[in-house]
Each structure stands twice: as structure tokens, then as C-alpha cells.
């Protein structure tokens, strides 16, 4: 199973929880992490390959004047996977999703003459493009099984890039993927991308927290599931401590800032720094648990020096 995930720097913290849950339930051979740095020091699993989007070829990093700047550069990377990755197919999962079960059956799907597999997007967004016949075909791009070989062969990547450069879309990458691939989609059960718009189902294998209602924001639908894996990750690592701090949550997509009290995970040195900077915002450091979690020791309290 080969996975691709894209994450901006302010989501690295949440990415660690997603990876923990993914590795817990699945045999994964490689994870391509598209990030804004050369690596994330505390994510040391050998299955992870970091790709710094700022060092990709210029033709990928260059924005068209028609690109919708409401979304980050990271949002468009999916349209370039066929050019960047030397793979036959990949499974893309958004950084705000959590894998809660084994998804090998999803990976094993033979796409044949289909460009990708995804879950139908219900509700108000299914017909926002105004394209005849699109209502029952529009998919959410948060979880995609992508046939890179076919996309290269039929030059669908070129078609997507051309649309990005010549027309403005409400949801740029998701819209162009739907427009270009609308007749080449294998439709999946919503258990593989359970959202508020695709349907929040009890037997979901991948829960996708869309819009501002993220899993790490307490009170969001099914946030207790995200926190279940978050807490497991803490318990199974010997390199973590908890601290309390004020965090400023900045979601550019909805243009507001929220201050919340929350527990974040940092190394001991970082914890000492936080204690002297109580107003520090955007704490996004976490350590990846050991590969063999059964051998990891729980953190122990240090005795006070007399």
C-alpha cells in the first residue's frame, strides 16, 4: 500500500496522529509526505519519504493568475502526482482525515480503465459546477485511489493543469479532477470517506473532518474518535510529555481565529520553553511513536531535585 498525504506546516502536529492510526491498522510500504520543509524531525519511520513542495520544479510551484488563492499551494499538488511520483497508483488521503480500520480492500481495487476511485459528494456541492449530468458524479477529493499510469497515458494531468490555468474554480483541485475524470471514476462506498456531506456512517473506515469542524477541535462531529488515537499515540511513546498552553487556531479558509485551551505534545526541552512563554501560539511539535509500539515504555514522572 502506497500513500500520499499533503500538509502545510501548521498541520504537522495533527499529521502525526493520522500516521499513527494509519500504521496501526494497515501494512503500508511507503508514505509520500508533501510538506513545506525537507523533513519533520520527529517523524522518523523509514516508510516515510518527505517531498518539499518548495523544491519541486518551477512549473509546479508557479501559480497561474487564475488559481484561487483561498487555498494553499498544497491543494494543487494532487494534479501533479503523475509527474512527481514514479508509481503505478497511489492512495491519497487528506491530512484532516483519520484511518480507523484496515483499508487493504480499497488499495486492492483494480481500476482498469478508470482514472481514480472516490466517494460521491452529496448535498449542495454536487451540482455547483453547473455541468449537465454532474450531480450524481461529483466526488470529494479527500480520499482518492489514483491510477497514475492511466493518467499519464491519456494525459489527463495535462488537461487538469490546463483547466487550472484557464478557469477559476470554487474548489480548484477537486473541481478540475471531477471535470477531467468525470467519465473515468470508480465510485466507492462512503465508508472510505465519511464526511458531513458524503454521509457520517457508523462503519466508516476513513473519517474525513471537512471545513472548520476538524477532529482535533473538541465538539466537532466524531472528534472523540480522533482523540482516541491521539491519546493512544501519547501513551505508547516514551518521548512525550504533556503541557497546557493557549493555542491560537488560525483557519485561513474561514478567516477567523479561535483561542482554545488544549493539551499539546512536545519534547521535554520544548516543554521548558513553553512554561516561560505562556502566550506562545501555534504549538505544532509531536514525536512519532516507535514502530514496535508494544515495546515502547510509558512516560515516567521525573523526581524533583532536592
Segments predicted by a language model, with ranges:
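N-terminal anchoring/stem segment of glycosyltransferases
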Residues: 1-60, 210, 229-239
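A glycosyltransferase accessory/donor-loop signature
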Residues: 1-7, 17, 33, 141, ...
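Active-site-proximal specificity loops/subdomain of glycosyltransferases
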Residues: 45-83
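Short, charged, surface-exposed secondary-structure boundary motifs
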Residues: 58-65, 125-130, 197, 216-219
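Short Gly/Pro-enriched turn/cap motifs at secondary-structure boundaries
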Residues: 70-71, 133-136, 166-169
Amino acid at each position: 500500500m502506497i500513500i500520499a498525504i499533503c500538509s502545510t506546516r501548521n498541520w504537522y502536529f495533527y499529521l502525526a496522529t493520522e500516521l499513527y492510526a494509519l500504521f496501526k491498522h494497515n501494512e503500508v510500504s511507503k508514505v509520500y509526505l508533501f510538506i513545506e520543509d525537507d523533513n519533520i524531525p520527529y517523524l522518523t519511520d523509514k516508510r516515510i519519504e518527505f517531498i518539499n513542495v518548495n523544491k519541486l520544479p518551477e512549473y509546479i510551484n508557479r501559480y497561474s493568475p487564475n488559481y484561487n488563492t483561498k487555498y494553499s499551494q498544497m491543494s494543487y499538488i494532487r494534479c501533479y502526482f503523475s509527474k512527481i511520483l514514479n508509481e503505478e497508483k497511489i492512495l491519497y488521503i487528506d491530512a484532516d482525515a483519520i484511518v480507523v480500520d484496515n483499508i487493504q480492500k480499497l488499495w486492492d481495487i483494480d481500476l482498469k480503465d478508470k482514472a481514480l476511485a472516490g466517494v460521491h459528494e452529496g448535498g449542495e456541492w454536487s451540482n455547483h459546477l453547473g455541468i449537465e449530468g454532474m450531480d450524481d458524479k461529483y466526488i470529494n477529493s479527500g480520499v482518492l485511489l489514483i491510477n497514475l499510469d492511466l493518467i499519464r497515458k491519456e494525459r489527463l494531468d495535462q488537461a487538469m493543469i490546463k483547466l487550472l490555468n484557464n478557469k477559476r474554480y470554487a474548489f480548484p483541485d477537486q473541481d478540475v479532477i471531477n471535470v477531467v475524470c468525470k467519465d473515468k471514476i470508480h465510485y466507492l462506498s462512503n465508508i472510505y470517506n465519511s464526511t458531513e456531506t458524503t454521509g457520517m456512517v457508523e462503519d466508516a473506515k476513513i473519517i474525513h473532518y471537512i471545513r472548520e469542524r476538524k477532529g482535533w477541535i473538541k465538539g466537532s462531529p466524531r472528534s472523540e474518535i480522533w482523540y482516541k488515537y491521539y491519546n493512544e499515540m501519547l501513551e505508547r511513546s516514551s518521548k512525550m510529555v504533556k503541557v497546557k498552553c493557549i493555542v491560537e487556531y488560525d483557519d485561513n479558509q474561514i478567516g477567523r481565529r479561535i483561542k482554545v485551551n488544549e493539551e499539546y505534545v512536545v519534547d521535554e526541552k520544548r516543554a521548558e520553553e513553553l512554561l516561560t512563554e505562556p502566550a506562545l501560539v501555534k504549538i505544532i511539535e509531536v514525536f512519532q511513536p516507535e514502530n514496535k509500539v508494544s515495546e515502547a515504555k510509558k512516560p515516567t514522572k521525573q523526581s524533583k531535585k532536592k
